Design a protein with these regions (language model features):
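Flexible coil/turn and secondary-structure edge motifs
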Residues: 1-87, 133
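Alpha-helical scaffold domains
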Residues: 84-291
Length: 291
């Protein structure tokens, strides 16, 4: 009875739910057990309102928290539940062969650009299905997914963010620019940057963020800057692509050389003269990979 608002030694058992799907399961199990037991059950059942980690009781919790238990928000439990659902859905769509192949394809070995990245073995189409099913996910959940060690979780987060962008561009772009740490492989960049930052810049005149990212020491942020211009190119705006290509003429990283070459090719599809002029002026300084 020294545990603040908790019931102390007067413990009781209970089974609780946090949504209607859980409630149906609880009611079913409760009824089955009661029928088997043959007598009314003393177990409580109802919606879960709050909870705390029970193991804290054995870790001098009251010494550290003299006012008693600090109950955790139920939103924490909901977040964990949906995160778990996404993980299960991704794993259900995984392929053992791809789980072996993808780490090699994305260069996850020591000293390589994707060092330490882990793969469940899920294809992009399968990941899109999971993202679509959770397109109403909170930013808290997207953040948690972006912090995952699993590549497909981070991709799923970015695909959900693209859906969020369609409803609230300002909020989605702000989130994207402050969570780029999780956008750390070329496919994660290429499948998100044009459709979030790139699309946003098409509708706004200030493109200075591209040049800020281009000066970043983080190669993935540099690639975000270049690949974001894909949407500008598709809308007839070539200036930023050309200027960024000039900035990266001396880049040593093959992923940046490829990104610049890709965007220049896209410009050439729409304005061959502009591309030829750029090549005639800069081809001597351009890396072979870019050419």
């Amino acid at each position: 009875n020294r545990q603040g608002n908790d019931c102390g030694t007067r413990y009781r058992t209970g089974i609780y739910w946090i949504d209607e799907a859980d409630r149906a399961d609880v009611e079913k199990v409760y009824e089955e057990v009661q029928q088997a037991y043959g007598e009314p059950l003393a177990v409580e059942k109802g919606p879960l309102k709050s909870f705390y980690p029970a193991e804290e009781y054995h870790q001098d919790y009251l010494v550290k928290n003299p006012e008693g238990y600090c109950h955790l928000s139920l939103s924490t439990l909901r977040l964990a539940k949906e995160y778990g659902e996404i993980m299960r859905n991704l794993i259900a769509g995984s392929d053992e062969e791809k789980k072996i192949v993808l780490p090699r394809f994305f260069k996850t070995g020591k000293g390589q650009y994707g060092e330490g990245d882990k793969f469940l073995g899920v294809t992009v189409p399968e990941t899109r299905k999971v993202a679509k099913a959770h397109k109403e996910a909170s930013y808290e959940l997207i953040e948690a997914l972006l912090e995952s060690e699993w590549h497909e979780c981070r991709l799923c987060a970015l695909l959900i963010l693209i859906e969020k962008y369609k409803k609230d561009p300002e909020a989605a772009v702000k989130f994207y620019l402050t969570h780029m740490k999780g956008v750390n492989n070329w496919d994660l960049v290429d499948l998100s940057a044009p459709y979030i930052l790139g699309d946003y810049l098409v509708k706004h005149q200030d493109h200075s963020v591209l040049y800020t990212l281009a000066q970043s020491p983080v190669m993935w942020e540099q690639r975000i800057a270049v690949v974001s211009t894909l949407m500008l190119i598709r809308n007839g705006q070539f200036t930023d692509t050309i200027e960024l290509a000039k900035l990266f003429l001396g880049t040593k990283h093959d992923l940046m050389q490829k990104a610049v070459g890709w965007m220049l090719r896209e410009v050439g599809k729409r304005d061959e003269g502009l591309l030829v002029s750029f090549l005639n002026t800069h081809k001597a300084a351009m890396p072979r990979t870019t050419l």
